[in-house]
Amino acid sequence: MMRGGMGNMQKMMKQMQKMQKEMQKAQEQLAEKTVEGTAGGGMVTVIANGHKQILEVKIKEEVVDPEDIEMLQDLVLAATNDALKKADELAAEMMGQFTKGLNIPGLF
């Protein structure tokens, strides 16, 4: 009886190691994937990776008004939040396969 228990334990450990490697690979892929957040009808674009690192900010010339810096700040903020939301969704989609069936609040 002990022998079967040990075999199951080894099998479980191997499955866990495999899953851990797959999760690590998915994390690496997240770093390479990008998402784009926009605001003002595309006047401001923010590009982030799946790890929520901002990689690029693009601002169209037409939206730059020295008399209204606050509007530009709002657009940059909105585009950044849009990009970060999309990065969260991407991470949840990619990592969700590993947490399927587990109900761990706040994990992804």
From Swiss-Prot:
Basic and acidic residues: compositionally biased ranges: 19-34
The UniProt entry, under Gene3D superfamilies, shows:
Nucleoid-associated protein YbaB-like domain
Which InterPro entries does the record associate with it? YbaB-like_sf, YbaB/EbfC
Q: Where is the composition biased (Low complexity)?
A: 9-18
The reply to whether Lyase figures as a keyword in the UniProt entry is no
Q: Which GO terms describe its cellular component?
A: bacterial nucleoid; cytosol
Q: Which one of the record's GO molecular function terms can you name?
A: DNA binding
* Coiled-coil stretches: none
Sorted alphabetically, which keywords does the UniProt record give? Cytoplasm, DNA-binding
Where in the cell? Cytoplasm, Nucleoid
Extract the ranges annotated as region (Disordered): 1-34
Report the main location listed first in the record: cytoplasm
Oligomer and partners: Homodimer.
Family per UniProt?
Belongs to the YbaB/EbfC family.
Q: What does this protein do?
A: Binds to DNA and alters its conformation. May be involved in regulation of gene expression, nucleoid organization and DNA protection.
What NCBIfam families does the annotation carry? DNA_YbaB_EbfC
Its recorded name reads Nucleoid-associated protein GWCH70_0020
